[in-house]
């Protein structure tokens, strides 16, 4: 506890030889309390610090409910007279400035029963009643029985459960307790029901109030036993602790905001020239050591601060200091990505919780240097003891109640907590949480023929508080302590070998081969993943820096991929019979089956990627090689996750199983200089980068950042691959090349739209060559229209085309015209309700067959045709669609390729102004939608389309489906790329987009088809 005296701050352990200026409220208003006198110096024989009576905000609650004390035995309540209550509250606000530093709460008006009425406030993300408002009036709660621990049934414990993957009705009837951040307390209740419409559970608290909550967004625990978890099919869940860190810090700042200013002991954001805003604490002049040379300044216009993390002192102006809460609301905690900045935030959070500065900060202050070395050492040990006890009481309870994890012969009962005040509780390979407890069966050191249970613990060393102590205790009473896990188990192995020498026992040599980390369970991938997800795990810099997943400089990069029809791994859009496209039915990610390692065909059943499956991590993992979120990710050999594209492009990484494309290996072989490269595109100093393949260029970038920036990330030139001398038995070596924006290869020259209009096209009757996998559609040709064909007429028609707007044709049914009635308002209003229903339907996860049936049943209500700005008629969306949605099926007459060629040459080409609507399924089937079909054949071509075509298989039948390539807004025209392939025809394009290539033809495909490739072995055959 911190008490303000004349001349600065003094802790309750320190000795003062002058009168105390500020006293607790209990001693001020107590008639029986003795007059405060200065304390005498402590004698050297005293082993404990003197006991000082101090004021507590709340009484310590017992664990077991007991009978209420009788009026005769109850302690006297200290409170002012009722008529002077308002006057005393006003007078006490200023006098408790320094006393509140150790309390962390506002001084309430004491009630008649001696306890303050609890003010329950809420800081939620979801909207709700007025009392959830951020600045709304807090509602008083009468919590007579909320904090009382009821005698629970045997086997019940408070656990956090998996919510998203569980049945919502399985939680109904369970007891629960919800954490309210602003109150920093749990409120008990029970789940009474579930609303299917709002997707929320009804919670009724023990004090009589009730509310509807989305359990996935709350910090909630359930009272449940192991048998009930199995019956209800519930699983133990790990909460999103990273998200809670900011909420807890904000809640602490809100609770102390009214009493935070620029006085000594207040928390602020301080600004120094050339540095980011940094959390600091205001200190007094007497706390600054004499050897610190600070910049002089006027006392009334400057303050002294000590920064968290760096522990440096500085004198700043008043305008350079910002209250801590205001800085959090202004997102100052996101302005810096340095490791010491994150450590300063953790120290600031610890200060708000305990109102005690870190030990290193106190040692640097002048008041810590006055005492003798013995007193300082005793005080340091005592403060460390208190700190360990406080932290254990604060966070240890959550992990004591975890469900034991069974991993073969290993059983982990407690994960413990991450130690942030010492760097000795982790190294480059492992993290050792304090309080970690595990059990393992092994041979007894007394009788090697008997297998007993060993208990393994990670404790804090009582002699050296900054170092861990590993303890192994057996059932027969043997206890072994060591500084490392290997030390403990090495001693056990030595005793077993010594016993083997004395007694002729057939002890196997392989029994004593396991390392200490293996025996404790720290090398297990599942345990390692759980430890990494503990709170404050990212503060273990040595561990994460060695793994390349350093927390320093990380910032998530969200990429809005425009080409949803491209594979997320190889970035190709071609689909083959033996390598079909797969789309995740939940996140809409598109990959090739071989690129993702799916060996068995799906046949239209539900398919989910690794991150969307039920066994996936609850918190979406981030790639350890780049900051880009989402995408095709696979697990690594060390328990992390990485993009397949990153693993393919980084030279040191590889795949252990190429067929299944997992796991990713070789992260430890990545050159340490590659981790230090800064991406020139996203600017995030995180992950491993590749460099430009130009001989003299060293520009670095992440592989996915380069793909998002349209840089050249491709295979080596095909013209050079055939020159490589390879044996037929060897796998061909393919070199991956990437070029920066300056050195990327120039794109193929695309013909301009004006050149196509200036030169009239000459129609040549040739044998129609069926294209591969694209629509055979001929846009309307203005040169083939009837009437005059002079250049003036063509120019007039082209100018007129620019002023034509999209006019959808809306079918509204019969309605009688009347004055002031808008005939289009009713259909638009009805479409609005359809939009909401469609969005709700799309949000559900369904298989390919279910999506196909839903598309067939609703495409008439979702789509309409009308006048198009591009050409003739087009198809428009009535409602909004998400990327990956099925839009419509391309329907027509199924014919053989020879029949389609005859129809096109003899009939369709002779019709003036008629188009050819043929879509090829494979080499044996073509869909002719010229005379029969749906409105899908009216979808126009665009060089920057919002849809794409794809052949899917549903119940053994193949269908051509038009998919949404990106999110489509209402009344937006649908377009896709025809990719017309013809060596002698050039069809002009009128889409008008900035990246228009001028023609409908697929120039790249035509160039590749013109090349003739012959295997090198065939050239030398006789």
Swiss-Prot record:
Residues 861-979 form the SET domain. Residues 127-139, 367-393 have a biased composition (Basic and acidic residues). Zn(2+) binds at residues 943, 989, 991, 996. It catalyses: L-lysyl(4)-[histone H3] + S-adenosyl-L-methionine = N(6)-methyl-L-lysyl(4)-[histone H3] + S-adenosyl-L-homocysteine + H(+). It is an enzyme of class 2 (transferase). S-adenosyl-L-methionine binds at residue 978. A zinc finger (PHD-type) spans 564-615, 677-744. It is found in: Nucleus. This is Histone-lysine N-methyltransferase TRX1. The lineage of its organism: Eukaryota, Viridiplantae, Streptophyta, Embryophyta, Tracheophyta.
């Amino acid at each position: 506890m911190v008490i303000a005296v004349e001349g600065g701050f003094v802790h309750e352990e320190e000795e003062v030889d002058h009168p105390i200026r500020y006293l607790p409220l209990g001693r001020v208003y107590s008639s029986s309390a003795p007059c405060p006198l200065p304390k005498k110096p402590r004698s050297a024989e005293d082993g404990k610090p003197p006991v000082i009576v101090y004021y507590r905000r709340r009484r310590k609650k017992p664990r077991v409910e007991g009978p209420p004390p009788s009026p005769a035995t109850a302690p006297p309540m200290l409170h002012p007279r009722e008529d002077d209550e308002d006057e005393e509250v006003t007078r006490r606000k200023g006098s408790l400035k320094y006393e509140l530093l150790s309390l962390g709460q506002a001084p309430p008006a004491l009630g008649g029963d001696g306890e303050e009425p609890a003010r329950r406030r809420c800081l939620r993300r979801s909207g709700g009643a007025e009392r959830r408002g951020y600045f709304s009036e807090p509602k008083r709660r009468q919590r007579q029985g909320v904090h009382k621990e009821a005698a629970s049934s045997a086997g019940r414990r408070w656990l956090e459960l998996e919510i998203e993957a569980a049945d919502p009705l399985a939680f109904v009837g369970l007891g629960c307790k919800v954490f309210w951040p602003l109150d920093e307390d749990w409120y008990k209740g029970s789940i009474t029901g579930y609303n299917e419409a709002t997707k929320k559970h009804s919670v009724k608290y023990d004090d009589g109030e009730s509310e509807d909550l989305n359990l996935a967004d709350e910090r909630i625990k359930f009272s449940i036993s192991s048998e009930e978890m199995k019956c209800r099919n519930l699983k133990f869940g790990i909460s999103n602790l990273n998200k809670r860190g900011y909420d807890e810090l904000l809640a602490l700042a809100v609770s102390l905001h009214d009493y935070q200013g620029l006085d000594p002991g207040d928390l602020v954001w301080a600004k120094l020239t050339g540095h980011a805003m940094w959390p600091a604490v205001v200190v007094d002049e007497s706390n600054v050591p004499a050897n610190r040379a600070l910049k002089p300044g006027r006392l009334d216009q400057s303050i002294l601060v000590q920064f968290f993390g760096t522990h440096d002192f500085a004198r700043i102006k008043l305008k350079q200091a910002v209250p801590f809460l205001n800085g959090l609301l202004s997102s100052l905690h996101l302005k810096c990505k340095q490791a010491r900045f994150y450590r300063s935030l953790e120290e600031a959070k610890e200060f708000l919780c305990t109102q005690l500065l870190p030990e290193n900060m106190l040692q640097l202050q002048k008041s810590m240097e006055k005492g003798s070395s013995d007193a300082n050492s005793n005080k340091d040990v005592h403060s460390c003891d208190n700190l360990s006890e406080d932290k254990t009481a604060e966070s240890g309870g959550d992990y004591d109640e975890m469900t034991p994890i069974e991993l073969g012969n290993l059983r982990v009962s407690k994960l413990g907590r991450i130690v942030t005040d010492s760097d000795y509780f982790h190294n480059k390979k492992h993290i050792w949480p304090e309080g970690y407890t595990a059990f393992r069966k092994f041979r007894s050191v007394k009788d090697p023929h008997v297998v007993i249970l060993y208990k393994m613990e990670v404790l804090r060393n009582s002699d050296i508080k900054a170092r861990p102590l590993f303890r192994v205790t057996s059932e027969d009473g043997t206890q072994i302590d060591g500084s490392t896990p290997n030390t403990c188990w090495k001693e056990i192995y030595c005793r077993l070998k010594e016993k083997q020498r004395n007694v002729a026992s057939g002890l196997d040599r392989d029994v004593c081969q396991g390392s200490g980390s293996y025996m404790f369970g720290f090398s297990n991938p599942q345990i390692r993943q759980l430890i990494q997800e503990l709170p404050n795990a990212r503060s273990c810099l040595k561990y994460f820096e060695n793994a390349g997943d350093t927390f320093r400089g990380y910032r998530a990069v969200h990429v809005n991929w425009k080409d949803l029809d491209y594979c997320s791994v190889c970035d190709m859009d071609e689909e083959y019979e033996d390598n079909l496209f797969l789309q995740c039915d939940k996140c809409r990610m598109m990959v090739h089956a071989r690129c993702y390692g799916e060996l068995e065909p799906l046949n239209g059943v539900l398919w989910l990627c690794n991150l969307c499956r039920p066994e996936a991590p609850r918190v979406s993992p981030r790639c350890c090689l780049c900051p880009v979120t989402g995408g095709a990710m696979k697990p690594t050999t060390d328990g992390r996750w990485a993009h397949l594209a990153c693993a393919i492009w980084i030279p040191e990484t590889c795949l252990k199983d190429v067929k299944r494309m997992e796991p990713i290996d070789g992260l430890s072989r990545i050159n340490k200089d590659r981790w230090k490269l800064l991406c020139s595109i996203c600017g995030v100093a995180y992950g491993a980068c590749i460099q430009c393949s130009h001989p003299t260029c060293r520009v670095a970038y992440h592989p996915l950042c380069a793909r998002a920036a349209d840089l050249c990330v491709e295979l080596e030139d095909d013209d050079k691959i055939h020159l490589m001398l390879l044996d037929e038995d060897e796998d061909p070596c393919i070199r991956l090349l990437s070029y920066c924006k300056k050195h990327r290869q120039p794109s193929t020259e695309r013909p301009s739209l004006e050149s196509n209009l200036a030169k009239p096209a000459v129609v040549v009757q040739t044998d129609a060559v069926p294209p591969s996998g694209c629509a055979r559609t001929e846009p309307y040709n203005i040169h083939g229209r009837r009437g005059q064909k002079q250049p003036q007429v063509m120019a007039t028609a082209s100018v007129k085309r620019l002023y034509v707007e999209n006019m959808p044709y809306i079918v509204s049914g019969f309605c009688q015209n009347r004055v002031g009635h808008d005939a289009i308002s009713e259909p638009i209003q009805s479409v609005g309700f359809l939009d909401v229903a469609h969005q709700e339907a799309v949000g559900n996860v369904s298989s390919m067959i279910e999506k196909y049936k839903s598309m067939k049943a609703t495409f008439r209500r979702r789509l309409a045709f009308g006048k198009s700005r591009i050409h003739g008629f087009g198809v428009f969306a009535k409602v909004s669609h998400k990327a990956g949605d099925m839009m419509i099926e391309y329907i027509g007459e199924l014919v053989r390729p020879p029949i389609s060629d005859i129809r096109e040459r003899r009939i369709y080409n002779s019709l003036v102004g008629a188009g050819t609507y043929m879509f090829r399924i494979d080499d044996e089937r073509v869909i002719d939608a010229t005379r029969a079909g749906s409105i899908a054949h009216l979808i126009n071509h665009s060089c920057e389309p919002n849809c794409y075509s794809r052949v899917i298989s549903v119940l053994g039948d193949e269908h051509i489906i038009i998919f949404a390539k990106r999110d489509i807004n209402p009344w937006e025209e649908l377009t896709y790329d025809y990719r017309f392939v013809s060596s002698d025809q050039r069809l002009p394009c009128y889409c008008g987009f900035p990246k228009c290539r001028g023609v409908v033809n697929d120039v790249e495909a035509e160039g590749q088809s013109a090349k003739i490739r012959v295997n090198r072995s065939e050239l030398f055959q006789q």
